């Protein structure tokens, strides 16, 4: 006879009932708030997961980007995986997607019974096709042979986004808008409207007039940022090592520096500015101070699991 292990004990064993971070206590119902799941960038830092932000509406988690270790950060929130309503990708750079396979698989193992809802730019379906092929044997074992997990939970339903409303229900309206991350095209930010509040996530972008338009009057703007001069300094180090590539030299063209992000927040008239994707994280306080030169509202230089209320 097959022995059935209660789901709670499985979740406990996998660490999905670990103690919550002190900044991340569960919110009351009927409101929107934001948890920064990952605030790092491609270079790995032990205390910074890859880019990922949770927008929580009435207890349902909408995940924007899924960088490395997103599942570990969700576990720190004691978050039941089936409450993930959907995942939204701003673009397909690997630092924003490397945690997606784990999020898909673990949420299924932990009880998700329906297809994972995934929204992203063109190319998302091809990425998902590869992901499912990569996991094909594992899915077969878990679904058909050993655990008899829900069949539909092993699926991903892809929604290719363009500018405009991409998701709407009784609680929340989510709008995608184009940002400037060229040569990466398309790249999107997302605007969440719920309970009379507005939260905007920039994704990766250089200063963008379109972002200012969509962020106008937002309660919270979550925006990427880098320290002015950082890329030039990094380029100088590379040159002394004989590195003739131009990757670092070009990075400043499609990201936003600290002084620029303050101007963006001021132009949009947002109430709170939350800085994420901090480059480099060790300069986060200096970055915050530079942003404050051009924006008089509240500024949060986020760490992983920082919770922000509108």
Residue positions per predicted region:
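Short amphipathic alpha-helical "recognition" segments used for binding
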Residues: 6-7, 15, 228
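Cap/insert and terminal regions of metallo-dependent hydrolase folds
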Residues: 188-189, 198, 206-306
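Binuclear metal-dependent hydrolase catalytic cores
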Residues: 2, 7-10, 23-213, 288-309
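C-terminal segment of classical bacterial N-terminal signal peptides
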Residues: 12-22
């Amino acid at each position: 006879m097959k022995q059935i292990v209660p789901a709670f004990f499985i979740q406990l064993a996998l660490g999905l009932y670990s103690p919550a971070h002190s900044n991340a206590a569960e919110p009351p119902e009927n409101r929107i708030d934001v948890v920064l799941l990952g605030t790092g960038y491609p270079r790995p830092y032990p205390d910074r997961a890859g880019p990922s932000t949770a927008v929580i509406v009435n207890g349902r988690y909408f995940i924007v980007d899924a960088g490395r270790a997103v599942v570990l950060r969700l576990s720190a929130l004691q978050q039941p995986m089936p409450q993930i309503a959907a995942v939204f990708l701003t673009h397909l750079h690997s630092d924003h997607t490397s945690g997606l396979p784990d999020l898909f698989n673990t949420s299924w193992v932990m009880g998700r019974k329906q297809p994972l809802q995934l929204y992203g730019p063109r190319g998302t379906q091809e990425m998902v096709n590869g992901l499912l092929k990569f996991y094909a044997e594992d899915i077969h074992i878990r679904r058909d042979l050993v655990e008899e997990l829900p069949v539909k939970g092993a699926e991903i339903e892809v929604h290719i986004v363009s500018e405009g409303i991409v998701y709407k229900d009784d609680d929340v309206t989510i709008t995608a808008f184009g940002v400037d991350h060229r040569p990466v095209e398309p790249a999107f930010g997302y605007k969440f409207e719920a309970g009379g509040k507005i939260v905007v996530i920039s994704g990766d972008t250089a200063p963008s007039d379109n972002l200012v338009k969509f962020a106008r009057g937002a309660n919270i703007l979550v925006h990427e940022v880098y320290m002015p001069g950082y890329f030039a300094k990094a380029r100088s180090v590379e040159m002394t090592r004989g590195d003739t590539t131009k990757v670092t030299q070009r990075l400043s063209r499609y990201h936003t520096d600290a002084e620029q992000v303050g101007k963006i927040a001021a132009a949009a008239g947002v109430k709170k500015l939350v800085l994420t994707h901090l480059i480099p994280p060790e300069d986060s306080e200096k970055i915050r101070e530079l942003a404050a030169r051009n924006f008089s509202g509240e500024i949060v230089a986020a760490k992983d699991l920082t919770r922000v209320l509108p």
